[in-house]
């Protein structure tokens, strides 16, 4: 039975010897438990106020990300990505036990690949700002993890080590296994400290036999009486016995199995049978409190590992040659217990290749073979727990239920969310995985999920995505798995955590007040979230790839909090009361669930409007939930999505004065110059800057006005760098607000002075953008007039790029190419400037004209008779015979032509209707655009006059800068993960080939 305390404390309080830890950090990486202990007690250490300069190997630093943002700038040259600019910094999560507790970002040196840097910080929200950085030069590629002996503290010539009594076995061994996966050239001996004399007892009253000293000390476990008991089908163990006996018959393996074989007949025996082969026989197992194991040989652990390593391949081949069939374990109540000495072999046989997500190394298998007990369950890095009994407090008489394994696996769990809930909160749980059945068979079953001993129905949202509601449950960890409504597990078993405490129902009026605009928006938003559509069965297999990708993006944003702005969550939390903060957390869970549901639905999905004409993105912007913008965009909502009145999310954020939300929207590409729908009161519409200015948010108004000017110019000059020599070199004259940075603060600077400096820079930037836009408009108008005067209406196609390039290069001096062209033209003109050359040219031209006239006259005279015959024929047939007319008989060739009367003069009574020209519409639109540009420039200039507006503008620049840095780091992490998936050989963090070679036993056993 799994000990509850092994899950209760993620990071047990370790008594670290800092001097020894610092000395060991010179040649090995620290383990997650040690790092967690340091980060949780960071106030006891010195936090560096500035980044180091080229730190040496073995250096350890603590930084505060809120204080020192650029702690990674250490002067070293790290390995770059393909672009040659961004540092290739990969990311992983480290576990303590079965729970992710640490972020780990690691980088490799460019010149020296063995020199590495690892940055760690906690996943807990209140400790995320403390960063632990470790520099180390790894000696060699891989070394096995072994026990480090200390001869100075040995007794009778042997080293005796034990684990701190306060450390939970699960945490200790999990960290040991993590080192085997993620460490480079390190030894698992930090939490193991030398002891002058061996431990002979423990707090549970169980005393190990003398022969068990080494095993118990290595694992640090304590066997106690189990509250649950299982009955194992003995016939299923015959196959295992056949393989073990064949292995036992080998001469070089006799000694190894003899060392492992206990002599007590009350435990599991290994019998040899020459006819039927060896089999494992389950006898009566006594209580662990009354049973002691008498080992025939007190073998040292190192000797056993060496012997097992030498004979591992033979053992694997013998087991792999058997035709093993899957078998299951079912729960029964009789008080019978199974000794755990051979439980690891049974677990290996129960796991099929489909459910085996990650193979463990040989060191894990050897440790489990030596002495895994029932209250110590090793867990894989994916967080799935073993098939074992999990204690439940709901049992009245101390009897617990164990998950029952079905005959075959029908579903593979990749991830699920959320992984915890309050005891009385029936939250929705999303399970992402893969069905191992055909679509017809998937719809045939009634799928359910088990939370401990409670089975709840599940709904299929899309192929591979299930949704269920967690039932009310007592606090604690329970097994979680998928069933076919028969209480038998058809997937891997995971762990769900029920947290103590009750869910508080918070009303929107308690947070935002009564009869306020925010309370009304919140209530309408909650009403929208409550709206769900039923997913039909014939739709769950449509567009599976796109839907799963969107769901994966949403869940990734939910798990990764790195997209949050630095300090944004803390600032909002300080502004709100505790009830408001709790309401925000509850609302966040509902929002993510709603987005996943809408992604799987048919129709508009999340692009829907409520009864009053607002959508989800508009509510998010109006309420200031900037943390929800990226998940909403990941669900497929456009950032410029309009409501019924033509308002975008940026309009709502500016109208409500949400600084962080405005900065996030502009950084993500929202159109700052978008207009609302025209109305009788506002025939020209309003921009977001106009709405912010009307509500007194002058800083936001100036920020958006500058953004509209610079972004409009950026759209016109999107490709001008390639064709314009003016912009091909040098710094950009006009920067967008997403590219700008706030003025850095130095010693002696006053905040008012810095905000004034930023505001003046904004005025200069906006003035240059407006001036260039006016030049572009004037140039386009002038070129059109020239073409209209020439009459070449087909060539009235002036590109914006040409006009912008000309406007940008007007102030520049002509280059060397213009001088050379002028010289060439002058040389050509000089050749024909003399009277002699000109006379020859005129004579030649006159002769050519005469020749052309003779040729044309000859052609006309040659065709004259044919033309006369044709005209006569047509005159007789059509004009005379067909139309019964006179034909050409009365035609007079020398008759005077009839004079055309002149048109009457244009008067006010009868004006002439002007000819329609589509350019008139463009002129009117351009006139309105110029008025808006002038108004935007006025908004930016007026911002300088108010200190509050200048401070608000500086805060917006700071948020935009922080958002840009977080986006760069997160995109680099995602790209690194993609590159590592394609190029596994470049990843020095985990050696996949060595793990596969070590786990031949596990891979060879198939059901």
From Swiss-Prot:
Start and end residues of each stretch annotated as Disordered: 148-227
Compositionally biased intervals (Low complexity): 165-176
Record-linked Gene3D superfamilies: 1.20.5.190, Ankyrin repeat-containing domain, Immunoglobulins
ANK repeats (start-end): 612-641, 645-674
SUPFAM superfamilies: Ankyrin repeat, E set domains, P-loop containing nucleoside triphosphate hydrolases
Tissue-level expression: Expressed in roots, stems, leaves, pollen and siliques.
Calmodulin-binding, as annotated region: 869-891
UniProt DNA-binding region: 18-144
Ranges of biased composition (kind: Polar residues): 148-164, 183-202
Molecular-function annotations in GO: calmodulin binding; DNA binding
Keyword Phosphoprotein: yes
Ranges where the IQ domain occurs: 821-850, 844-873
Any single biological process term in GO: response to freezing
Residues with PTM Phosphoserine: 942
The entry's keywords: Activator, ANK repeat, Calcium, Calmodulin-binding, Coiled coil, DNA-binding, Nucleus, Phosphoprotein, Repeat, Stress response, Transcription, Transcription regulation
Pfam families on file: Ank_2, CG-1, IQ, TIG
Domain notes: The two IQ domains are probably not interacting with calcium/calmodulin.
Family of the protein in this entry: Belongs to the CAMTA family.
Physiological role: Transcription activator that binds calmodulin in a calcium-dependent manner in vitro. Binds to the DNA consensus sequence 5'-[ACG]CGCG[GTC]-3'. Regulates transcriptional activity in response to calcium signals. Involved in freezing tolerance. Involved in freezing tolerance in association with CAMTA2 and CAMTA3. Contributes together with CAMTA2 and CAMTA3 to the positive regulation of the cold-induced expression of DREB1A/CBF3, DREB1B/CBF1 and DREB1C/CBF2. Involved in drought stress responses by regulating several drought-responsive genes.
Name the record gives this protein: Calmodulin-binding transcription activator 1
Chain's gene name: CAMTA1
């Amino acid at each position: 039975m799994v000990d509850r305390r092994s899950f209760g404390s993620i990071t047990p309080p370790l008594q670290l010897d800092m001097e020894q830890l610092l000395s060991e950090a010179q040649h090995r990486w620290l383990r997650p438990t040690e790092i967690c202990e340091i980060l949780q007690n960071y106030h006891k250490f010195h936090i560096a106020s500035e980044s180091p300069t080229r730190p040496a190997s073995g250096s350890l630093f603590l930084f505060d990300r809120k204080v020192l943002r650029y702690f990674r700038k250490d002067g070293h040259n790290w390995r770059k990505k393909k672009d040659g600019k961004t540092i290739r910094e990969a990311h992983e999560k480290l576990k303590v036990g079965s729970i992710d507790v640490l972020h780990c970002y690691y980088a490799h040196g460019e010149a020296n690949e063995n020199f590495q840097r690892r940055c760690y910080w906690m996943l807990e929200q209140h400790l995320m700002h403390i960063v632990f950085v470790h520099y180390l030069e790894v000696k060699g590629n891989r070394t096995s993890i072994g026990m480090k002996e200390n001869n100075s503290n040995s007794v009778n010539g042997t080293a005796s080590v034990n684990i701190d009594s306060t450390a939970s076995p699960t945490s200790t061994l999990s960290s040991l296994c993590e080192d085997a996966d993620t460490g480079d050239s390190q030894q698992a001996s930090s939490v193991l400290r030398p002891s002058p004399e061996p431990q002979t007892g423990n707090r549970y009253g169980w005393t190990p036999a003398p022969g068990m000293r080494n095993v118990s000390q290595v694992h640090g476990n304590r066997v106690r009486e189990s509250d649950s008991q299982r009955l194992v089908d003995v016939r299923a163990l015959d196959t295992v016995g056949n393989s073990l006996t064949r292995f036992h018959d080998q001469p070089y393996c006799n000694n190894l199995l003899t060392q492992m074989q206990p002599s007590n007949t009350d435990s599991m025996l290994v019998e040899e049978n020459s006819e039927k082969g060896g089999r494992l026989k389950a006898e009566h197992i006594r209580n662990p409190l009354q049973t002691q194991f008498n080992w025939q040989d007190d073998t040292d652990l190192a000797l056993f590992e060496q012997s097992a390593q030498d004979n591992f391949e033979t053992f694997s081949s013998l087991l792999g040659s058997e035709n093993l069939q899957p078998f299951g374990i079912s729960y029964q109540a009789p008080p019978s217990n199974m000794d755990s000495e051979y439980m690891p072999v049974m677990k290996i046989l129960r796991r099929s290749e489909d459910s085996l997500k990650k193979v463990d190394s040989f060191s894990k298998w050897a440790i489990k073979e030596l002495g895994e007990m029932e209250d110590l369950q090793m867990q894989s890095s994916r967080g799935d727990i073993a098939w074992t009994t999990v204690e439940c407090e709901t049992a009245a008489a101390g009897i617990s239920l164990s998950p029952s394994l079905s005959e075959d696996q029908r579903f593979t769990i990749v991830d699920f969310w959320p992984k915890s809930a309050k005891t009385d909160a029936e939250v929705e749980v999303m399970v992402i995985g893969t069905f191992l059945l055909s679509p017809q068979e998937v719809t045939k079953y009634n799928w359910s999920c088990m939370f401990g001993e409670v089975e709840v129905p599940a709904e299929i949202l899309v192929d591979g995505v299930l949704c269920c509601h967690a039932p009310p449950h007592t606090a604690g960890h329970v097994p979680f798995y998928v069933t076919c409504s028969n209480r038998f597990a058809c997937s891997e078993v995971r762990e769900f955590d029920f947290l103590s405490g009750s869910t508080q129902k918070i009303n929107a009026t308690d947070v935002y007040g009564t009869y306020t605009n925010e309370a009304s928006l919140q209530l309408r938003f909650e009403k929208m979230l409550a709206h769900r559509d039923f997913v039909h069965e014939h739709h769950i297999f449509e567009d599976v790839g796109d839907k799963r990708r969107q769901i994966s993006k949403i869940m990734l944003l939910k798990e990764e909090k790195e997209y949050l702005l630095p300090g944004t969550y803390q600032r909002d939390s300080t502004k709100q009361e505790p009830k408001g903060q709790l309401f925000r957390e509850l609302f966040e869970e509902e929002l993510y669930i709603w987005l996943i549901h809408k992604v799987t639905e048919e129709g508009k999905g999340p692009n829907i409007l409520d009864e009053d004409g607002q959508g989800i993105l508009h509510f998010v912007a109006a309420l200031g939930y900037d943390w929800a913008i990226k998940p909403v965009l990941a669900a497929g909502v456009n950032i410029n999505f309009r409501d019924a009145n033509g308002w975008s999310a940026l309009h709502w954020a500016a109208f409500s004065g949400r600084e962080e939300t405005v900065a996030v929207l502009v950084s993500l590409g929202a159109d700052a110059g978008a207009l609302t729908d025209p109305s009788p009161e506002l025939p020209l519409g309003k921009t977001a800057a106009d709405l912010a200015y009307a509500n007194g948010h002058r800083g936001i108004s100036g920020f958006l006005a500058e953004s509209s000017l610079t972004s409009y110019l950026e759209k016109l000059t999107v490709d001008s760098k390639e064709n314009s020599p003016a912009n091909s070199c040098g710094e950009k004259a006009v920067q967008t607000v997403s590219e700008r940075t706030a003025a850095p603060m130095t010693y002696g600077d006053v905040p008012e002075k810095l905000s004034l400096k930023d505001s003046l820079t904004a005025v200069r930037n906006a003035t240059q953008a407006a001036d260039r836009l006016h030049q572009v408009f004037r140039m386009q108008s002038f070129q059109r007039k020239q073409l209209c005067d020439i009459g070449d209406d087909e060539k009235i196609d002036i590109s914006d790029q040409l006009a912008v390039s000309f406007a940008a290069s007007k102030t520049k001096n002509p280059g060397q190419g213009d001088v050379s062209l002028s010289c060439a033209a002058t040389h050509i003109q000089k050749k024909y400037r003399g009277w002699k050359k000109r006379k020859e040219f005129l004579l030649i031209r006159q002769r050519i004209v005469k020749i052309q006239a003779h040729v044309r006259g000859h052609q006309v005279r040659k065709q004259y008779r044919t033309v006369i015959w044709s005209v006569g024929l047509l005159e007789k047939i059509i004009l005379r015979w067909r139309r019964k007319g006179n034909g050409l008989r009365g035609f007079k060739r020398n008759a005077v032509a009839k004079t055309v009367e002149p048109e009457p003069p244009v008067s006010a009574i009868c004006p002439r209707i002007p000819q329609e020209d589509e350019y008139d519409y463009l002129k009117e639109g351009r006139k309105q655009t110029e008025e808006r540009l002038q108004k935007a420039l006025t908004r930016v200039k007026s911002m300088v006059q108010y200190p509050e507006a200048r401070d608000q503008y500086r805060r917006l620049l700071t948020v935009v800068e922080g958002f840009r840095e977080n986006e760069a780091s997160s995109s680099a992490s995602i790209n690194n993960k993609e590159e590592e998936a394609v190029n596994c050989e470049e990843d020095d963090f985990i050696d996949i080939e060595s793990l596969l070679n070590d786990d031949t036993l596990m891979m060879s056993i198939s059901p």
